[in-house]
Amino acid sequence: MSEQNTPQVREINISQEMRTSFLDYAMSVIVSRALPDVRDGLKPVHRRILYAMNDLGMTSDKPYKKSARIVGEVIGKYHPHGDSAVYESMVRMAQDFNYRYMLVDGHGNFGSVDGDSAAAMRYTEARMSKISMEILRDITKDTIDYQDNYDGSEREPVVMPSRFPNLLVNGAAGIAVGMATNIPPHQLGEIIDGVLAVSENPDITIPELMEVIPGPDFPTAGQILGRSGIRKAYESGRGSITIRAKAEIEQTSSGKERIIVTELPYQVNKAKLIEKIADLVRDKKIEGITDLRDESDRTGMRIVIEIRRDANANVILNNLYKQTALQTSFGINLLALVDGQPKVLTLKQCLEHYLDHQKVVIRRRTAYELRKAEARAHILEGLRVALDHLDAVISLIRNSQTAEIARTGLIEQFSLTEKQAQAILDMRLQRLTGLEREKIEEEYQSLVKLIAELKDILANEYKVLEIIREELTEIKERFNDERRTEIVTSGLETIEDEDLIERENIVVTLTHNGYVKRLPASTYRSQKRGGKGVQGMGTNEDDFVEHLISTSTHDTILFFSNKGKVYRAKGYEIPEYGRTAKGIPIINLLEVEKGEWINAIIPVTEFNAELYLFFTTKHGVSKRTSLSQFANIRNNGLIALSLREDDELMGVRLTDGTKQIIIGTKNGLLIRFPETDVREMGRTAAGVKGITLTDDDVVVGMEILEEESHVLIVTEKGYGKRTPAEEYRTQSRGGKGLKTAKITENNGQLVAVKATKGEEDLMIITASGVLIRMDINDISITGRVTQGVRLIRMAEEEHVATVALVEKNEEDENEEEQEEV
């Protein structure tokens, strides 16, 4: 009767079991699968592949062997996982676009940068690369510890000697449980120089280290933008860098431009990149590309992007950087196993741990060589004794019945050890010649000297460091190459929105009811004075264009409100609409408060500290403030000047500190004074009196007046004139001014005062939205107190709403007759 198994049921808490089992699994993944060792930079699978190849004799000087042979050896002896996982790891070690210095020398199809898979392992062949031999060098000299394999039938290395800093040289990437590592590759010579620097100066700082290790060096080259991300990663162990493809814009023989991409960011799939660009072109997310082709071959990479003749290649390239993998970020996480525990390391710590490992390797190798040398010297000492007493030794051996008796006799008679006695018995007769005796003596003396040197090394830390430096320098001389990845410090680390938008001249309009829009400056065609105009925008009965400026899509536009606050927006941030469209409410663009409206707009190309903003309020108060104080404006605005009760900001102009200012009023008065009469004030200051007003008068315009310019006035009934600047004498700030126009019921009160050089076009917009654009030179030059000429024909109930001077448009219309008044 067979024995029955006694059932044993053990109850356990499921939450405790889940916790324990998952922790065991997590630690197994962390320690035995996903993370590299800081000493050799290898994960277990990579270490096992190299060890198995070395065991099979597949060194760099031997013929290639089938990859399947290697995979079988690895999974059969050391790595209890699937063959595909091992083969994929080996393939990566043989890819020059994945490893900065390949550890496997592959023969056959090992994949491509297009994402093509490697051929099956039964077709490909491999052997160790020359540099991977340095990872295993001295492995037979007791330099490392061994451990049992998964079933206890074999022994495998815990770590490799790694005679160069592989962790930083080839990098590593892996996802464990609750943590991940992503270490970029580096240039071999630079990393070795870093190790040497740490060995010579243990107190070296990260900035000092970065003088010899400027940053990562990727196998696919490319460009790293800026050093701040590199430094942060090196100092803290974590950081992010931006990698950009190397692209150039070249001119074709037909005059068109093309973009040539010759290097890609690390781990970017070329085929998918080209597909993505094609998708963007097809979906019209990027316009201006006429052709896209891959001209890469065995000599190098070359992606050609043909550009339409009227398109801007720089803008298209910036869009490609922004929307495709031509520019990517690489998150650095210097996580590695230190004494079996995962730790985030700084650059210096990585180098220190490697240096400590090499000290152990050199000491263990030296101790091994010392043991070997002492053992050999011990034997030679016995042989020397035998040769010194040759006749007695021969007689003893001849008279001994057995080898055991002879060995015992030698030990007792000549005070030898058992090993020495055995060596004498094993010695061939030819070694009794005089020449052989000299060789034994020479070998013994050299061993005595070697033993002294080895003991000196073990007793002297400095000697160990010297050996490390010498051997690292020798490896650098053999394997060093040129840096591939360029670190760009002069360009932007990130692409700004304006880099994706072509610079173009635009007109920005703002209506009385607060609708803003932009449209190309070319939308408006030039007409002659007295024309009927074209419809400039769609308005209703209670809205009209109040502000109009000529600017650029890349300029910063400052919006000043009636309450003395300033807001900002880029030209391209203002939505573009057609000529007759109203635009969008300003509150959708700026965070203006209730009861606040925009009544001055200034375009700024650069916030130069030598430039000023000159302010004038409705009640004649003026202020001058440096433009640089307005460089940083919050989304909810900034106080531009403090207003007195019932006052409003009327006008703002950009000056250089040396200009003449004119201020015009509704009742036809104008004052001219140097801007230096108004001292420079802080941003929130209230200002000083610019012009003295009567109770029923308000300011309608403030301008900068050049010497050879003219003063332009426009009245509410559409009349206007130009008057030479010299007719307005300079007064002191705060005066009442001079009469500048004859005000009648026919022409109405002043609505605008402008300064012109005769190089502009004049835009007039009525309250109903009718717009006319005319050459400023078509307006008559008359005296200071004249009434002027009709500039625009309007219905009886119409009036001029706003006036602006814009860049001249050369397109002309037929002249219409001038009507003098």
From Swiss-Prot:
Which residues act catalytically here?
123 (o-(5'-phospho-dna)-tyrosine intermediate)
Instruction: Identify the EC number(s).
Output: 5.6.2.2
Q: Which reaction does it catalyse?
A: ATP-dependent breakage, passage and rejoining of double-stranded DNA
Where found in the cell? Cytoplasm
The chain positions of domain Topo IIA-type catalytic read 35-500
GO MF term (any one): DNA binding
Q: Name the GO terms of the biological process aspect.
A: DNA topological change; DNA-templated DNA replication
SUPFAM superfamilies reported in the protein's UniProt record: GyrA/ParC C-terminal domain-like, Type II DNA topoisomerase
What Pfam family is a match for this entry? Answer: DNA_gyraseA_C
Q: Which GO terms describe its cellular component?
A: chromosome; cytoplasm; DNA topoisomerase type II (double strand cut, ATP-hydrolyzing) complex
Q: Report the protein's function.
A: A type II topoisomerase that negatively supercoils closed circular double-stranded (ds) DNA in an ATP-dependent manner to modulate DNA topology and maintain chromosomes in an underwound state. Negative supercoiling favors strand separation, and DNA replication, transcription, recombination and repair, all of which involve strand separation. Also able to catalyze the interconversion of other topological isomers of dsDNA rings, including catenanes and knotted rings. Type II topoisomerases break and join 2 DNA strands simultaneously in an ATP-dependent manner.
Query: What else does the entry mention about this protein?
Result: Few gyrases are as efficient as E.coli at forming negative supercoils. Not all organisms have 2 type II topoisomerases; in organisms with a single type II topoisomerase this enzyme also has to decatenate newly replicated chromosomes.
Task: Specify the protein name.
Answer: DNA gyrase subunit A
**Source taxonomy lineage?**
Bacteria, Bacillati, Bacillota, Bacilli, Bacillales
| Gene from which this protein is expressed | gyrA
